[in-house]
Amino acid sequence: MRVSDFNFDLPDELIARYPKTDRVSCRLLQLNGENGEIFHRTFSDVLDLIDQGDLLIFNNTHVIPARMFGRKASGGKIEVLVERMLDEHRFLAHIRSSKSPKEGAELFLGEDKLGENNGIKAVMKARHSSLFEVELSDKSTALLDVLQTIGHMPLPPYIDRPDEEADKECYQTVYSKVPGAVAAPTAGLHFDKNLLEKLKAKGVNFEFVTLHVGAGTFQPVRVENIEDHVMHAEYVEVSQEVCNAIIATKKAGKRVIAVGTTSVRSIESAALSAEEFGNPDLIEPYFSDTSIFIYPGKKFRVVDCLITNFHLPESTLIMLVSAFAGYKNTMNAYKHAVQEKYRFFSYGDAMFINKNSNVRELE
């Protein structure tokens, strides 16, 4: 298939630049992946769509304030976006500047918050393709503490506004736990603590995986045929406890419901690993990077239902949804969402989708 097959017209006013005040009050488009049937709901209705004994899989990654502003020793301004923390003092980052810093260049970070000539000193140690390896000069302060002091919440480029104090809470799931993401697993933003308590009281089971969402999630697909696209790598943790819960849920005839595409990619990576290594179990623990790319024709081994936001045209995420619900069903649902003026992207509305069982084997 061609990347252009996943394009659609989206009026700018449908891009949500601020979240709803009440997390569960957003709209929910329910899509039956088997027949394409559509229902218009409110997100709080998921309480009626999820049954006792079903298993919800959440991504518990915590978004770090990964964007920093500063300057090079030469005086040139820089914008630094942490992609991955390597240890307490080193990180990989995207750096925007008029001229890329060279190996050994000194950087001064956070002067927009700390004042001129008071920036935190760092050194560009090496370049790895499009990423820069940076090390803090002062080893007495950990990177996470530095980010809490001078970092900005890394809002996606399409939100097109500076981050605000409220984003520290709004652009974070209520169950986030493990620091490391530079983008939120946005489907989870719609759950508040009250809804989680109601689901638990109903007998719905919860498990948590970790996938640290990278800035690569916003990168455009630059090839013509989707099969030629190479996904960026992101770190994933799927524990034995999660695997046991998934296997037990399947044996009981209940559904595994992934909250967000990152949860899908996490557990499907673990299931694919089990198959490739000849593990007789459906899924096995997974603690590694994944670059799994799911597009129409790929097989889902575990996930039965998906809760997800509305994604960018021609993105790998709309391709994943198309693989799950069927291409025609997905594009038709997006057409309806635009007509009905749903809000799109990270701070927008959501979908609840059950899988289209008519999919080919993963090649």
Curated annotation (Swiss-Prot):
- Localisation per UniProt entry: Cytoplasm
Q: Which GO terms describe its cellular component?
A: cytoplasm
User: Pathway, per Swiss-Prot/TrEMBL?
Assistant: tRNA modification; tRNA-queuosine biosynthesis
Q: Name one GO molecular function term.
A: S-adenosylmethionine:tRNA ribosyltransferase-isomerase activity
Q: What class of enzyme is it?
A: transferase
| Keywords on record | Cytoplasm, Queuosine biosynthesis, S-adenosyl-L-methionine, Transferase
- Say which domain of life the source belongs to: Bacteria
Catalysed reaction equations from the record: 7-aminomethyl-7-carbaguanosine(34) in tRNA + S-adenosyl-L-methionine = epoxyqueuosine(34) in tRNA + adenine + L-methionine + 2 H(+)
What is any one GO biological process for this UniProt entry?
Answer: tRNA wobble guanine modification
For this chain, the annotated S-S bridges are none
Q: Does the keyword Cytoplasm apply?
A: yes
Q: What is its main location?
A: cytoplasm
Q: Name one Pfam family in it.
A: Queuosine_synth
Keyword Cytoplasm among record annotations: yes
Function according to Swiss-Prot or TrEMBL: Transfers and isomerizes the ribose moiety from AdoMet to the 7-aminomethyl group of 7-deazaguanine (preQ1-tRNA) to give epoxyqueuosine (oQ-tRNA).
The subunit field of the Swiss-Prot or TrEMBL record says: Monomer.
Q: Which HAMAP family match?
A: QueA
The entry assigns this protein to a family as follows: Belongs to the QueA family.
| The protein's name | S-adenosylmethionine:tRNA ribosyltransferase-isomerase
